[in-house]
Amino acid sequence: MSSDIKIKVQSFGRFLSNMVMPNIGAFIAWGIITALFIPTGWLPNETLAKLVGPMITYLLPLLIGYTGGKLVGGERGGVVGAITTMGVIVGADMPMFLGSMIAGPLGGWCIKHFDRWVDGKIKSGFEMLVNNFSAGIIGMILAILAFLGIGPIVEALSKMLAAGVNFMVVHDMLPLASIFVEPAKILFLNNAINHGIFSPLGIQQSHELGKSIFFLIEANPGPGMGVLLAYMFFGRGSAKQSAGGAAIIHFLGGIHEIYFPYVLMNPRLILAVILGGMTGVFTLTILGGGLVSPASPGSILAVLAMTPKGAYFANIAGVCAAMAVSFVVSAILLKTSKVKEEDDIEAATRRMQDMKAESKGASPLSAGDVTNDLSHVRKIIVACDAGMGSSAMGAGVLRKKIQDAGLSQISVTNSAINNLPPDVDLVITHRDLTERAMRQVPQAQHISLTNFLDSGLYTSLTERLVAAQRHTANEEKVKDSLKDSFDDSSANLFKLGAENIFLGRKAATKEEAIRFAGEQLVKGGYVEPEYVQAMLDREKLTPTYLGESIAVPHGTVEAKDRVLKTGVVFCQYPEGVRFGEEEDDIARLVIGIAARNNEHIQVITSLTNALDDESVIERLAHTTSVDEVLELLAGRK
């Protein structure tokens, strides 16, 4: 599946589930009332059972319609969406969940486009009149159209779907649904499948039969639990160590996303969850299992809470059978894996890349065209598809580390990707969702991960945030302490001429590049010849590679008396020179510095400000124009 198609499918599924998930509390309330008070319930009560019909016929579809309209057209969209949904409800003889998913967004879309059309055209004093009557008239028209057209069409469509489902049930084909459901879950379509497809079908079946198997096709925690148990006994390295905690969160907490990375780590395990899912559905079909309402989240506790009287054995058997088959298949696949230590190698490789990125001042597993300066970060959001389970746990882990580090000015929360606010500074998402997040808030920095409970990544990020905040604080302290002798005008101090710029250079070693920069400082009258050796001596103490293709060689403290006046030479090495300790610590911009007293602090600060943009660095590394270099360093970009 291509990236664009996957994002579109995720977005559409996300939209469907966004209409249902905010109203899950209402579904659960209806499910509990049904389980308790209907004639076959735990506490049969003819009076209280009268709540069941109106809630499923009117309340739940209206809530979905209102939410769908609000998603598209705001508050006014929600009102018109609810009015339109009422037309669908009255126009059909069955609960209109699918109809409300069409009518609600349609109402929101119509009022949204009407508001755009009249924007700026309403005379002063008539705004409230137009707003109220437009919503009423458009809602009336859409309700009539929904009553006459959408309702009957959706009713016919629902009957066709029901016939198809009944065909699958009668011919014992329902387990085949797991072939599509389980892989789709791994692509983070689990909420879309459960709340966008199975919940509407399940509610209708539950209303007729008192329970529905559809609520357990996707929500069954058995297949994922089997995979995690297999990792606990037969996994290796960090995957084995973390599987126990993940199993508790998955099985009791109902956060299914927690096991996705374990399957992605070894894609062959998709076969295990498919076979486990098929076994679970088959067992539920044979034994007559099902729930009265959606189990959200998909925890064994939620499953038991939504189980009607007489279905406990069937539901528990369905979960256990799915878990057992998934465990056996996963164990076989893990034990016979041709690539030994596969999960360890991938984890170690990612950790190595994270640590290397950290050492060079880059975000671990950062994605997109973003800056790596974290000094401005004040708002961090851990985002997932639904903005609930997995991201909430990740945000909790990171929040504790941030608080323990004393970074009280930084807030850490969780959110659904579609609800990311424009003022977020840093977004953390699963790697399969990062592209969607970048489209939602392109101005923010983005970090990808493969496991929302990756403590190592959060520790690395916290350390970088601490370092960035400390650097900013130290810079302010330096400026305050030197303000009397400090000239904040970079034009007075940091002023390059064409004679200080050397383009298209080549060097085999960093010593050769440093020696050339030193010789140019001597020729420019900035330093005495002995300063060149002091620059080489300084490099032996600690590499002067800053990261981002920049090195700033300069002399030792003892050589300051060899500086005649503050000066800078800019040397470009398009092919690069290795300056750092790592093989890819390649400098393309070598900036030799000589400064008297504390003036080097001002010089470095000025350079940092000028080279704060990655695109500027890229242009400086390849330009053949001295004038362009002068303009870029002067900030005239």
From Swiss-Prot:
The active site is at C384 (phosphocysteine intermediate), H554 (tele-phosphohistidine intermediate). The phosphoenolpyruvate-dependent sugar phosphotransferase system (sugar PTS), a major carbohydrate active transport system, catalyzes the phosphorylation of incoming sugar substrates concomitantly with their translocation across the cell membrane. This system is involved in D-mannitol transport. Also able to use D-mannonic acid. The keyword Membrane applies. It comes from the Bacteria. The chain crosses the membrane at residues 24-45, 50-70, 134-155, 165-185, 273-292, 313-334. The modification Phosphocysteine is found at C384. InterPro entries: PTrfase/Anion_transptr, PTS_EIIA_type-2_dom, PTS_EIIB-like_sf, PTS_EIIB_2, PTS_EIIB_2/3, PTS_EIIB_mannitol, PTS_EIIC, PTS_EIIC_2. It catalyses: D-mannitol(out) + N(pros)-phospho-L-histidyl-[protein] = D-mannitol 1-phosphate(in) + L-histidyl-[protein]. Gene3D superfamilies: 3.40.50.2300, Mannitol-specific EII, Chain A. Its EC number is 2.7.1.197. The record marks R538 as: Stabilizes the transition state in the phosphoryl transfer from HPr to EIIA. Residues 378-473 form the PTS EIIB type-2 domain. CDD domains: PTS_IIA_fru, PTS_IIB_mannitol. It is a multi-pass membrane protein. The EIIC type-2 domain forms the PTS system translocation channel and contains the specific substrate-binding site. The PTS EIIB type-2 domain is phosphorylated by phospho-EIIA on a cysteinyl residue. Then, it transfers the phosphoryl group to the sugar substrate concomitantly with the sugar uptake processed by the PTS EIIC type-2 domain. It is found in: Cell inner membrane. Residues 494-636 form the PTS EIIA type-2 domain. Keywords: Cell inner membrane, Cell membrane, Kinase, Membrane, Phosphoprotein, Phosphotransferase system, Sugar transport, Transferase, Transmembrane, Transmembrane helix, Transport. This is PTS system mannitol-specific EIICBA component. Homodimer. Signal peptide: none annotated. GO terms for biological process: mannitol transmembrane transport; phosphoenolpyruvate-dependent sugar phosphotransferase system; sorbitol transmembrane transport.
